[in-house]
Amino acid sequence: MERTLQSVVGRRRGSSNRGRGKNSLISTPSYALHPPPRFRYPRWEFVRQTEYSMTACVRKGKLVLTYQYAIWKRVWTIETGFTDPSLFMTPAGTHTTEEIGHLDLFWLRYCSCPHEMPPWLDFLRGTLNLRISCRRALQASVLTSTPRHSLQRLAALQLCTNACLCWYPLGRINDTTPLWLNFSSGKEPTIQQLSGHP
């Protein structure tokens, strides 16, 4: 049976844009043309649509948290109302937040201790020490009750992980001070240290 396709070249399998004119309406999306840049994000933040990074800075004397999802341009900022951020730095370099808009509702809901409801402001100021078992229960309840990769889980987890740590004052903090501080050396930690690699 002779072939019905009468072209000199033979049957064209799907060649990518080569033999056709470049004026087709649907073009290859630009992100598919070039290989994605490597090491654009820290190695613990693989680019998924749901992953965010959090930084903190001081604006007009108040601590401002900034959340940015890895592949979106949009940045969320949450003003905490703190005037002295050194109170809210832990040795690990993480931040706790007192009033993050409506997120403190989640905080109030999930900080229930098995024995009693801890006064949450004391908890935040670091004057209240939860027992370790309570803190583990607290973390577990946060993980089961909040959606993954959400700001509310982030805030609640940070609040409950910072519970039993002691607070170190950092000295004077102004707009240029980096808030990821390594407490042993006083410098910013490397990405390896931040991501938990030795």
UniProtKB/Swiss-Prot annotation:
Entry superkingdom: Viruses
InterPro entries: Lenti_VIF_2
Keywords, alphabetical: Host cytoplasm, Virion
Magnesium in keyword set: no
Gene Ontology cellular-component annotations: host cell cytoplasm; virion component
Subcellular location as annotated: Host cytoplasm; Virion
Effect of residue 66 to I: In strain: Isolate R29-Nadin
Compositional bias ranges of the Basic residues kind: 10-21
Pfam families hit by this protein: Lenti_VIF_2
Chain spans, region Disordered: 1-31
Other comments on record: The sequence shown is that of isolate R29-127.
Function: Determines virus infectivity.
Protein name (record): Virion infectivity factor
Organism of derivation: Bovine immunodeficiency virus (strain R29) (BIV)
